[in-house]
Amino acid sequence: METLLKPFPSLLLSSPTPYRSIVQQNPSFLSPTTKKKSRKCLLRNKSSKLFCSFLDLAPTSKPESLDVNISWVDPNSNRAQFDVIIIGAGPAGLRLAEQVSKYGIKVCCVDPSPLSMWPNNYGVWVDEFENLGLEDCLDHKWPMTCVHINDNKTKYLGRPYGRVSRKKLKLKLLNSCVENRVKFYKAKVWKVEHEEFESSIVCDDGKKIRGSLVVDASGFASDFIEYDRPRNHGYQIAHGVLVEVDNHPFDLDKMVLMDWRDSHLGNEPYLRVNNAKEPTFLYAMPFDRDLVFLEETSLVSRPVLSYMEVKRRMVARLRHLGIKVKSVIEEEKCVIPMGGPLPRIPQNVMAIGGNSGIVHPSTGYMVARSMALAPVLAEAIVEGLGSTRMIRGSQLYHRVWNGLWPLDRRCVRECYSFGMETLLKLDLKGTRRLFDAFFDLDPKYWQGFLSSRLSVKELGLLSLCLFGHGSNMTRLDIVTKCPLPLVRLIGNLAIESL
């Protein structure tokens, strides 16, 4: 939802492999002269005609590299030794490198392209970045957000929203890393090897770099983090575009957080039926009368919703809104794993970012949370590596993993995962009813929930308030669809408390 920005617009810290779909208009094995097309086929063909609109426009933006004089590891040196090796130069990786290195810890950051611009758009609540001292990294702010529940009801939220300036944020983090003498190495990490008190990474060019601790910040697709439970994720999937348009219907002082309306599918019965079961919403950032970021998003599904389906719904929506796209500036394909189990705690490789479990299980938000938790993890690392006792090996791994995931934070995450499991059981009508009640709550509850600021007790109170504010149908949804996820929640909380 945040990039999609998105958790997982070419998502997040390290972009996962995008889902790509290929449409073949006239397969050679079908003969139109001998086969009569079914009604379903005709409906699909109608959608395909729409599908050929702005989706056929190539993005005009080109990959950009930043001009920063960073310090490189000597590729010819045979003795590259560091305290901490960070795999990945996404937002989470650079934030951690900045935070750890300011304590005098020797840090090396390894990435295939450390100076390349991040490809995603990131959205955050303005107060989140203000609290982190990063408000100067926002390039646009909206004083209000809105949520369209249906054609007859809209919620207006007095909480400012902002778009992160990828360039400003990356420059800020890189410059801090330069000041703190962080070293960079341009390569892809193929393997991580461990000894009792030391680990090594092996890069695709054969280079080996040694360190006391390896932290994986390479994103969701990483193979370096281990799990001891099945990874039953939910998935957020979205298609986002920054586009130049003739005009659009959005108020420039309001960011559209969610638009759950489905009137745009009135002439698309095939799409409308599917949307009623597994709904998608529009996320919109209007910058000017002719410039807007648009994203069609499946909040969470299991298995992941078809990417082709998401794009077709977006085409139908923009056509209904009368938005004519003149050019596509940027395009994002985003898939974010949400919820599921945490990595095995502890283990030899530390994690931060998409593969560490910090993605909000109910919303997909992660960037602001990564910025907030990197200093927490940095302190745990420094307590080990910066101590006079020189803690290494298993003691260090235990300290850093539990620094990121203490018991209370693990229990809170289980509660947010319960929220995700509830969303998975709701159709469009149920989802609308839930958000109608959710945004009627005291702002401290809905704001705290979306920003991962609530305790287990506060989340319990939120649930009671939600039940009280909900319609009779919402209460029925909760009573009939939540018992099994609730049993799982209680079981998981019991396991975490052992």
From Swiss-Prot:
Cited Pfam families: Lycopene_cycl
GO molecular function, one term: oxidoreductase activity, acting on paired donors, with incorporation or reduction of molecular oxygen
Enzyme Commission number, as recorded: 5.3.99.9, 5.5.1.19
Reaction it catalyzes: all-trans-violaxanthin = all-trans-neoxanthin; a carotenoid psi-end group = a carotenoid beta-end derivative
Targeting signal (transit peptide) range: 1-42
GO biological process: carotene biosynthetic process; ubiquinone biosynthetic process; xanthophyll biosynthetic process
Keywords of the record: Chloroplast, Isomerase, Plastid, Transit peptide
InterPro entries associated with the record: FAD/NAD-bd_sf (IPR036188), Lycopene_cyclase_b/e (IPR010108)
Tissue: Expressed exclusively in chromoplast-containing tissues of flowers and fruits. Expressed in preanthesis flowers.
Protein family: Belongs to the lycopene cyclase family.
The protein's role, per its UniProt record: Involved in the synthesis of neoxanthin, the last product of carotenoid synthesis and a precursor of abscisic acid. Involved in the beta-carotene biosynthesis.
Name the UniProt record assigns to this protein: Neoxanthin synthase, chloroplastic
Origin species: Solanum lycopersicum
Organism placement in taxonomy: Eukaryota, Viridiplantae, Streptophyta, Embryophyta, Tracheophyta
Gene: NSY
